[in-house]
Amino acid sequence: MNIFKNFEKKIKKSIELSDIKGKNGEDLDLSKITVDPPRDSSHGHLSTNAAMVLAKSIGLSPRALADKIIELLKNDISIENIDVAGPGFINIKLTKLFWQDAVKYMLELGLSYGRIPMGQGKRINVEYVSANPTGPMHVGHCRGAVVGDVLSNLLQFAGYNITKEYYINDAGQQIEVLAHSVLLRYREALGQKINEIPEGLYPGEYLIPLGQALAQEFGDQLLTMDRDEALSIVKERAIHTMMSMIREDLAALNIYHDIFFSERMLYADNARAIRNTINDLTLNGYIYKGKLPPPKGQNIEDWEPSEQTLFRSTNVGDDQDRVLIKSDGSYTYFAADVAYFRDKFNRHFDEMIYILGADHAGYVKRLEAMAKAISGNKAKLSVFLCQLVKLFRNGQPVRMSKRAGSFVTLRDVVEEVGRDPVRFMMLYRKCEAPLDFDFAKVTEQSKDNPIFYVQYANARCHSVFRQAQEVLHIESFSNDILITYLHRLIDDNEILLIRKLSEYPRIIEQAVVHKEPHRLAFYLYDLASCFHTHWNKGSENLNLRFIQPHDKELSFARLGLIQAVINILSSGLSIIGVEAPIEMR
């Protein structure tokens, strides 16, 4: 139950059934009416802009129209007080009975509270991570991995049928470089002295065990056999080993994809998938032979003046046409990307989501263009770019050097601070904004550490039930007992906490609509803060403590409120993919 949406519908219905019409008696456009929490909680529980957005079309001042709308709503039994504020906002205060019933509804639904059936089984493909299989995942991959995984969980929670996909870039030049790098480590394992890793090869020590494994399996056979045959063997072993490493890295973050799609599949059978894609585009007038002008402000060495096979992507919104087949007959990386999108589209997803690194910003237009061309403008596509993660330790930057092969791996971070802090903190900024990750901050036990603060709220809630068992001499508390006495929840602090709990379905809906999982992390922190504030007031005022030894009914009512907090914290943390601990020491 999204109380904000419910009241929005109620206000719209009241206006539709009233004599409030446009200047010429026409029906009004009510689509811009919203109901939200007021910015200042002292102004009421709900606030609507109805009078502000309709006044001009009616020919009244917003305040005058607000008075008319108030007349329509004032007899609603759930409303305690309704008035107009400022230029014409309508503020609504709801009855205590309404909020007590809201807790009852939360307890009846349990962990399903907030689960709005928005998706209705629609199929969405979410592609995320898709790191090159050339080494272990580093911290730069971490943010997109978490954002993609939590967004997938969020969409599933809202009723969508989600496919989590990883595209393995295993057919490009980087795989050639990987194979030569592994061969170097193989020779090293056989006893050859390698003074320095040549420029352009991967210098990381993570390839040493693979070189040793090849030496153990093949001895020196790879040195004597045909070089292409040897490279083919090394490629297969290297890709398999790197992908196993990547899967283990992702598993450390509790991330598991449904599909791992190999780029090499697109090149199978003489690149049939790519050829078919280009044939389709040709039939629709998107392919021509031509020359592209030299790129402005870029390295002219990468420009080819010869005639090539081009995709007329400017016809579908791109800023320049794209090469699909070079003059030597080889396919570009982009040709494989287009074929991959065609494969996805032919799997009949209702929407395709790409989670990419910020370095792919220039790729978005061509991705949108290929989607329009392949689908005839029918594909629904969403692209999200994740900005960089900067590592700190006690406020000091952590230095890394790609050239030297020294970088902080995803596994390093998870092993040092734990999975939960990594997952939660990667969401604690909008993905479009850079994120600072401080190893010290994410492990400290304070309000300044969001994941600790949220999990501690859940643990505190469970401690209240343990205390209740001892003080009230009751082994377990059924929903029926907790619901029976909710009418005792009348304190303003309790109502404030209920109001925050009631925002959960709205937050879920907004996070799904905008595809912004960080909204959920922010909300859980705010809910935890609201709970901790209420807890602390019990230290100052014994009457506000959750357990009242001489008043079982009030204790049961407050335990019902605590159970609602537990349910929503557990639900939200489950979507984010972190634990909801019942005890913390």
From Swiss-Prot:
Keywords: Aminoacyl-tRNA synthetase, ATP-binding, Cytoplasm, Ligase, Nucleotide-binding, Protein biosynthesis
Entry annotated with the keyword Transferase: no
Catalyzed reactions per annotation: tRNA(Arg) + L-arginine + ATP = L-arginyl-tRNA(Arg) + AMP + diphosphate
Biological process according to GO: arginyl-tRNA aminoacylation
Compartment(s) of residence: Cytoplasm
EC number: 6.1.1.19
InterPro entries for the chain: aa-tRNA-synth_I_CS, Arg-tRNA-ligase, Arg-tRNA-synth_N, Arg-tRNA-synth_N_sf, ArgRS_core, DALR_anticod-bd, Rossmann-like_a/b/a_fold, tRNAsynth_Ia_anticodon-bd
Short motif 'HIGH' region, span: 131-141
Domain of life: Bacteria
Example of a GO cellular component annotation carried by this entry: cytoplasm
GO molecular function: arginine-tRNA ligase activity; ATP binding
Oligomeric form and interacting partners: Monomer.
HAMAP family: Arg_tRNA_synth
Family, per entry: Belongs to the class-I aminoacyl-tRNA synthetase family.
Annotated protein name in UniProt: Arginine--tRNA ligase
Organism the protein comes from: Bartonella tribocorum (strain CIP 105476 / IBS 506)
